[in-house]
Amino acid sequence: MDPPAGAAGRLLCPALLLLLLLPLPADARLAAAAADPPGGPQGHGAERILAVPVRTDAQGRLVSHVVSAATAPAGVRTRRAAPAQIPGLSGGSEEDPGGRLFYNVTVFGRDLHLRLRPNARLVAPGATVEWQGESGATRVEPLLGTCLYVGDVAGLAESSSVALSNCDGLAGLIRMEEEEFFIEPLEKGLAAKEAEQGRVHVVYHRPTTSRPPPLGGPQALDTGISADSLDSLSRALGVLEERVNSSRRRMRRHAADDDYNIEVLLGVDDSVVQFHGTEHVQKYLLTLMNIVNEIYHDESLGAHINVVLVRIILLSYGKSMSLIEIGNPSQSLENVCRWAYLQQKPDTDHDEYHDHAIFLTRQDFGPSGMQGYAPVTGMCHPVRSCTLNHEDGFSSAFVVAHETGHVLGMEHDGQGNRCGDEVRLGSIMAPLVQAAFHRFHWSRCSQQELSRYLHSYDCLRDDPFTHDWPALPQLPGLHYSMNEQCRFDFGLGYMMCTAFRTFDPCKQLWCSHPDNPYFCKTKKGPPLDGTMCAPGKHCFKGHCIWLTPDILKRDGNWGAWSPFGSCSRTCGTGVKFRTRQCDNPHPANGGRTCSGLAYDFQLCNSQDCPDALADFREEQCRQWDLYFEHGDAQHHWLPHEHRDAKERCHLYCESKETGEVVSMKRMVHDGTRCSYKDAFSLCVRGDCRKVGCDGVIGSSKQEDKCGVCGGDNSHCKVVKGTFSRSPKKLGYIKMFEIPAGARHLLIQEADTTSHHLAVKNLETGKFILNEENDVDPNSKTFIAMGVEWEYRDEDGRETLQTMGPLHGTITVLVIPEGDARISLTYKYMIHEDSLNVDDNNVLEDDSVGYEWALKKWSPCSKPCGGGSQFTKYGCRRRLDHKMVHRGFCDSVSKPKAIRRTCNPQECSQPVWVTGEWEPCSRSCGRTGMQVRSVRCVQPLHNNTTRSVHTKHCNDARPEGRRACNRELCPGRWRAGSWSQCSVTCGNGTQERPVLCRTADDSFGVCREERPETARICRLGPCPRNTSDPSKKSYVVQWLSRPDPNSPVQETSSKGRCQGDKSVFCRMEVLSRYCSIPGYNKLCCKSCNPHDNLTDVDDRAEPPSGKHNDIEELMPTLSVPTLVMEVQPPPGIPLEVPLNTSSTNATEDHPETNAVDVPYKIPGLEDEVQPPNLIPRRPSPYEKTRNQRIQELIDEMRKKEMLGKF
């Protein structure tokens, strides 16, 4: 993938999955700070003011200061403000009967009267919004779009469009022919205060670039560059833009008969919900999609496409994290598309059945700057019709429109097509995206590519706002003859043209009128499929064929099951599969695909393995010992059971050396046990399938405590005992053995000692806990001998327990530390058939040995204001009153919990608490930001605090993000190649561009002296004029000498830069012209990025000094579309070295611009010899071979002649 481009845009991957990198506003919160309200368009050329809109009647008369909707969308709590009563106001209502609204707003000195109508086609009837919780609970509410409006500006109905939301203030886009405005409230949640003094809004303004702003002005006439020259430069820079705009005007579409409706499922992950807040996120999403809908209504698209919301799902945090894989856009898109497919309603007539899924997230699913990811031409496909979009404010509407454009079949402009000239002017499908609120359009290539595929997207044909359509025949032409279709196309009397028999009637439908049967007409389209074209034949896809059943719309059906394949394991219960295909018949011509799973499985080889200690999961981890390195080292990998039950069919392994748990990024083999706590449920293709102890899939039958399937514990025996020894030697001390088959094993030290417990496998002799040279006193959970063990060391008292069953006998040992006596207690359950007859520690009834005892009180349900807490019970051994595992009290009835009140003190008011500002993200440049934590906390009575929801804090939220270190980075001078010499003979000048650039090729600040940009070039002497012997050639040189008789006017000026006056100033290819004074003034900001105060030297000031030390270099202009006319400074004498002999032709000439003087200067031919200097004013009849100097002389002559008149 190519790296991101510069500030102008981001490169997009040209692969089949297209990703979008788009520079958008840094923030787009609905609750914006007054200092820097985010969300609107920002950057070069953007202006903003504060305005207070008011609601009016149709004639613009004041009705109320309340601009917010009377009701808010479902799920959003806002207090309704009654409209203000205006004394003496009559005539006009708040809204007309059609639901229209009218607002007046004054922006940048212009009074705009907005005429709005409800956008009733953005939210489909029956649409819902779902809030998914962490526990799996879902809250469903109807989705209402009552506060979404579109319309125009009074007086500009044909050239303006408005898309606004008034859920909470006015937010949206006002677009006119010459300029665009983006409006949003300065602060959110103040609807209740609107009636008092109105609501303050921020209005952003940007002029369109279709007409360049006027240049020059009064100061332009004072410079050495004429106003005409500046205007020609402006026109030259606007040629390309005007051409595209004119082509857009030629492409204005006519309203199509068929509307296309994209019914959208909008998925929103938790990062978006948390950023905008649960109170504001729904109306923000509706406003965003309202703008997307308006983008698809732009006339440059050439089709009428409606974006219709049928369902919004706001995901929980856990689900959001599982869908987005950080830094992996391909996998993230696959997860999102799979999720959207699972949300699809099976019935196509369901109100929530969607055609396309749009997923919004603020997580970084790809490299820095990636904004979107989508398949190409996937519309209406059950899995591929989806897009993944990075939400970053209202400008994200262009991300959504761009990615959905890919799904509709549009490619990048300029890549494989001829629309690269529209990229810089805001085409939505540009690879370097320039689209913004102030300018956007669909290129001619996007229009052509859309028309190529749009007719094939049948799912967009249905209208969610109309119902009870009669069922259409599979082939509509079966009911309409060619004569009837001609009448529909051209009017009464028209019939199929029969004058010519040489054409195929199914290729194009030709029609004629009986009054003129030889004049045939066509709309260049074929007849409807199914139209009869010959006896027994019908038109289908442009061909006249026999109509057989296999070409009609056909739903798919499952074929027969294949035989079961081989078993995944040779012993220990494996899985074998069989599959089926949706080919009985295949779905065809828009028919439905098969529903249900394409595979089935059953258990196999359930006999025990010869190696009773074999652990299938352990074997899979061990296979990676030689192949998988972690931390640049090899490890011995042990099995690990994940805490999350959903992850237990994925392979996780634990390093024996470091204890780190690592995901192997793969699923466990089919037939692996889901959990060590369940001996029967198995993993099948990454999912845990419930299996009962009877070996039946889905069975709920379980073993009793000693392993009898469906048993009642009647065959279970409890074995327990205490064993004590005194350490008399170094090394291990054997205590006792626990037999195979033991379950619910508990081994515990009777007293606190410094000894260490150790366990080894009797059959293999391998230690499973605390090998002598590798004692680990830390509490842990580990897998060994096919079961899960829990080891605890609490203040020197060790405990080891497992649910079992043990697959082999273990030996319990102790590593002594000191002389203290060793005492261990043990207890386990075992089936009576496995019990050793010599074991005297068998207890017939152990239920009386344990009891439920009060362990602690639960935490109070509220930190203040009166809460509740309940008793929590634990299992206690009666013998020594020690708390043990609760499983030992399973046979004892648990007492009911006791409730009591707690924390009766009153609650204090929550306040905002801010953290320290983090270091700036950049040391220099234009993107430095620093953030800090902002929390709403509530003080508690015990001098602690707790975090609460932000809605409980009444004050304005403090700023949590601000710009920093916004200054240019240090750079280095970079010089280009020297230009060609300005003359073809004699002495001229050469120039080269010299720019200050940083390492990332942006503008910087250079402390070193700037390298020279101009130098003298000396070519061979110019040929003499030999046609007239009386005339000799002389060389005239301009010098910057002060003439006391002709005082030099002060022409240098300094002015504060007001910003670039053309969007082309940011093109790097034009930066080399910054040395031209006129261009420097036009593009003062781009040419002088390190300094807001731009020196504008429209004409070089004559330096003062002695005549022999002063010389002025005239710049060489190489701009092909720009002619700079510079008048020579008045009163500057000319130096005339005379070329009277050929011997001096090769001598060194110090002049910078040489002109031939084709006439004789009296008295000088014999008296003056080169290189004498003769002060002299240039004659108006001088002629030069240097075309640039000749143009300057001609301009001077014209001005002198005009002065005489």
UniProtKB/Swiss-Prot annotation:
Glycans are attached at residues 104, 245, 942-943, 987, 1025, 1092, 1139, 1144. One of its GO terms (molecular function) is zinc ion binding. This is A disintegrin and metalloproteinase with thrombospondin motifs 2. The keyword Lipoprotein does not apply. Its EC number is 3.4.24.14. Binds 1 zinc ion per subunit. Residues 1053-1091 form the PLAC domain. Residues 474-554 form the Disintegrin domain. Residues 555-610, 848-906, 908-968, 969-1023 form the TSP type-1 domain. Keywords: Cleavage on pair of basic residues, Collagen degradation, Disulfide bond, Extracellular matrix, Glycoprotein, Hydrolase, Metal-binding, Metalloprotease, Protease, Repeat, Secreted, Signal, Zinc, Zymogen. May belong to a multimeric complex. Binds specifically to collagen type XIV. Residues 717-845 are annotated as: Spacer. Residues 29-253 form a propeptide. Disulfide bonds join 337-386, 380-459, 419-445, 486-511, 497-520, 506-539, 533-544, 567-604, 571-609, 582-594, 981-1017, 985-1022, 996-1006. The N-terminus is blocked. SMART domains: TSP1 (SM00209). Zn(2+) binds at residues 402, 406, 412.
